[in-house]
């Protein structure tokens, strides 16, 4: 027997007998053998015990590699499965996964595992880690595994996709499959943490049973684990779902509709302020705001191309019984096209700018839904401008300036520009017109170059009908998210037969510019909630001033008078008339992150004044009511976020 192993640098190692991945790594360098945790053999992940006995390409994976971390986390998931099965013999196991975020294991148990039980599971896992229990890598016939798991429908479902020979791992009597590569023993899983539990439908389908998903993470070094746990704590503190619950901004009840948020009065106030701001900004910039129906004949979406390219993200059409099929709109473009088409248009009218806070519906699977960020019903800050060919660059610059002005008011500074093109290797998902794509992509690029702005280019990120400029922001949780878009569209004007009468008296085809300034209200307010950590700047805060009388009987009426004076001037204030201690009320006002807390006692009432405490400070300052009104008025007009 003789064979060669080709390494990543192109060099080869020759062998005259079979070698394990561990032995292969050691033959390259002793230090590599010690650091190795697995290998990629012909592109597939394999464990250290995997035997090589033929010509292959091999890349050794160490604990410094991202793939190495995934191997560690997969091993932690496997150990969690084994320990959970020892502790709860009746438990059934579903899917498992390890990636850059950590790992998870799906379980099915009549009495669900409580989050308070995770420390006990961790303790049992630590015992196995301390003992360095051996994890055996082998293979078994698919039929053998079907016999072992004959009473476990979850495992039988997973086995359907396996080949006749299945790689399996054993820890004592425990056996499982579906792992690419695991460590040969439990000894290296020292730095891990079980994080949380949540529900997950089997195979991601809402028609299947709901299982319990246990999340965890693991690192080779304790310092890395500590840093990750610190980051997760910060994320939890900023999570808009947590803040939304604590501040009573919104809720979602799966019993009445997953992905359909209910806006509570405070959350609705924030949304209303943002919507009014956006509408005023757009009207001042030359947009005409409209209202259009959320239902549309399905034929419009066949004409637009949504039916062919976007159907999987649309709800099923409604048969009205008379041949009419109505569809909940997934996008507003066809609606604004109808506004344009309602009149004969002249070149003198161009650009025609149409905007709407348009409600849309998109078919999202339940597993993808998340708070306000991924919902099934959303309101998009949408706009479409119809221009002549020679107006594109000027209008593009105008839209971009509007976006930058809005970013300045919300203090959005962490962003970059991305030109999103179609994927030339997968053109089936895009409108088929090579000339149009080349023309629109080059025009978009030229417009950015004219403005002297830096940008990255990304293939495969375009809309199906045209390229776009995406403005990518970093959320408070560190995720990359598209906040704003500007898209050039030559396709829809052609498909809907849009025209305008030119200076020559002939009909011409307009170009359509799609643009979204802040995306959907739902996602934007989720973004703001996390960026501000719930401490909204005064102009956005649902309650701008909390008024607390020291003694209800003595000062309650004066507190109401102060609220009325503030309300007359357009400020949002509440009076806390509850029969609670003063200190408790002040603390709760701070917990609710109200910008101003006004405490009113004898001195304040006699002087027609207020005692003011800003959120996040201990300092209390007495001043006249007029002075406070001037202060809060200047604060609201500043449109600035507290640094």
Swiss-Prot record:
State where the protein is found.
Answer: Cytoplasm
Any binding details for the cofactor?
Binds 1 zinc ion per subunit.
Biological process terms from the Gene Ontology for this record are: threonyl-tRNA aminoacylation
- Primary localization class, coarse: cytoplasm
- Coiled-coil stretches, from where to where? none
Segments carrying the region annotation (Catalytic) are 239-537
One Pfam family per UniProt: TGS
List the GO terms this entry assigns under cellular component, sorted alphabetically: cytoplasm
Q: What keywords tag this UniProt record?
A: Aminoacyl-tRNA synthetase, ATP-binding, Cytoplasm, Ligase, Metal-binding, Nucleotide-binding, Protein biosynthesis, RNA-binding, tRNA-binding, Zinc
List residues binding Zn(2+): 333, 384, 514
Q: Which cofactor does it need?
A: Zn(2+)
Q: What GO molecular function terms would the record report?
A: ATP binding; catalytic activity, acting on a protein; metal ion binding; threonine-tRNA ligase activity; transferase activity; tRNA binding
| Catalysed reaction, written as an equation | tRNA(Thr) + L-threonine + ATP = L-threonyl-tRNA(Thr) + AMP + diphosphate + H(+)
Q: Which residues form the TGS domain?
A: 1-62
Q: Which Gene3D superfamilies match?
A: 3.10.20.30, Anticodon-binding domain, Bira Bifunctional Protein, Domain 2, Threonyl-trna Synthetase, Chain A, domain 2
Taxonomically, the superkingdom here is: Bacteria
Query: What EC identifiers does the entry list?
Result: 6.1.1.3
Question: Subunit arrangement?
Answer: Homodimer.
- Report the family membership: Belongs to the class-II aminoacyl-tRNA synthetase family.
What function is annotated for this protein? Catalyzes the attachment of threonine to tRNA(Thr) in a two-step reaction: L-threonine is first activated by ATP to form Thr-AMP and then transferred to the acceptor end of tRNA(Thr). Also edits incorrectly charged L-seryl-tRNA(Thr).
- Protein name (Swiss-Prot/TrEMBL): Threonine--tRNA ligase
Name of the coding gene: thrS
């Amino acid at each position: 027997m003789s064979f060669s192993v080709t390494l990543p640098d192109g060099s080869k190692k020759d062998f005259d007998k079979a070698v394990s991945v561990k032995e292969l790594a050691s033959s390259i360098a002793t230090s590599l053998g010690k650091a190795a945790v697995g290998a990629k053999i012909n592109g597939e992940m394999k464990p250290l015990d995997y035997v090589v006995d033929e010509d292959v390409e091999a890349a050794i994976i160490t604990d410094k590699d991202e793939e190495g971390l995934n191997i560690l986390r997969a091993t932690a998931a496997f150990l969690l499965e084994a320990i959970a099965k020892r502790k709860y013999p009746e438990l059934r196991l579903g899917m498992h996964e390890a990636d850059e975020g950590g790992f998870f294991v799906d379980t099915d148990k009549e009495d669900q595992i409580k989050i308070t039980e995770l420390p006990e599971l961790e303790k049992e896992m630590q015992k196995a880690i301390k003992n360095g229990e051996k994890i055996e890598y082998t293979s078994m016939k698919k039929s053998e595994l079907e016999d072992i798991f004959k009473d476990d429908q979850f495992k039988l479902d997973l086995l359907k996709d396996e080949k006749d020979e299945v790689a399996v791992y054993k820890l004592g009597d425990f056996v499982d499959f579906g792992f690419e590569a695991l460590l040969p023993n439990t000894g290296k899983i020292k730095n891990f943490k079980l994080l949380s539990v949540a529900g997950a439908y089997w195979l991601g389908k809402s028609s299947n049973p709901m299982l319990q998903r246990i999340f965890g993470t693991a690192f080779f070094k304790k310092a890395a684990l500590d840093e990750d746990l610190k980051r997760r704590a910060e994320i939890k503190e900023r999570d808009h779902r947590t803040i939304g619950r604590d501040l009573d901004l919104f809720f979602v009840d799966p019993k009445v509709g997953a992905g359909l948020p209910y806006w509570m009065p405070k959350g609705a106030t924030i949304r209303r302020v943002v919507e009014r701001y956006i509408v005023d900004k757009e009207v001042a910039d030359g947009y005409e705001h409209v209202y259009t129906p959320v239902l549309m004949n399905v034929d419009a979406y066949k004409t637009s191309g949504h039916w062919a390219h976007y159907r999987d993200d649309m709800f099923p059409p409604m048969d009205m019984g008379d041949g009419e099929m109505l569809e909940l709109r997934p996008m507003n473009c066809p609606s604004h096209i109808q506004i344009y088409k309602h009149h004969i248009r002249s070149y003198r009218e161009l650009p025609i700018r149409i905007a709407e806070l348009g409600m849309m519906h998109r078919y999202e699977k339940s597993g993808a839904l998340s708070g306000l960020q991924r919902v099934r019903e959303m309101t998009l800050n949408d706009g479409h401008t119809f221009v002549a060919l020679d107006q594109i660059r000027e209008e593009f610059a105008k839209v971009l300036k509007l976006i930058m002005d809005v970013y300045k008011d919300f203090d959005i500074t962490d962003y970059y520009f991305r030109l999103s093109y179609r994927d030339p290797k997968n053109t089936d998902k895009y409108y088929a017109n090579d000339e149009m794509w080349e023309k629109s992509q080059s025009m978009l690029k030229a417009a950015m170059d004219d403005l002297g702005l830096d940008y990255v280019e990304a293939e495969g990120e375009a809309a199906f009908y045209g390229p776009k400029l995406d403005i990518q922001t970093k959320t408070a949780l560190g995720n990359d998210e598209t906040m704003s878009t500007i898209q050039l569209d030559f396709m829809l004007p052609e498909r809907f037969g849009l025209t305008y009468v030119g200076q020559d008296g002939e009909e011409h085809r307009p170009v359509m510019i799609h643009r979204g300034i802040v995306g959907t209200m739902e996602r934007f307010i989720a973004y703001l909630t996390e960026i501000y950590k719930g401490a909204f700047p005064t102009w956005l805060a649902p309650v701008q001033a909390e008024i607390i009388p020291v003694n209800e009987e003595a000062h309650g009426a004066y507190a109401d008078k102060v609220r009325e004076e503030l309300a007359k001037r357009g400020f949002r204030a509440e009076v806390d008339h509850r029969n609670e201690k003063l200190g408790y009320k002040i603390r709760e006002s701070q917990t609710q992150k109200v910008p101003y807390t006004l405490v009113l006692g004898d001195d304040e009432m006699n002087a027609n004044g207020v005692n003011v405490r800003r959120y996040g400070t201990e300092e209390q300052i007495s001043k006249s009511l007029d002075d406070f009104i001037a202060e809060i008025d200047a604060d609201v007009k500043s449109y600035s976020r507290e640094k």
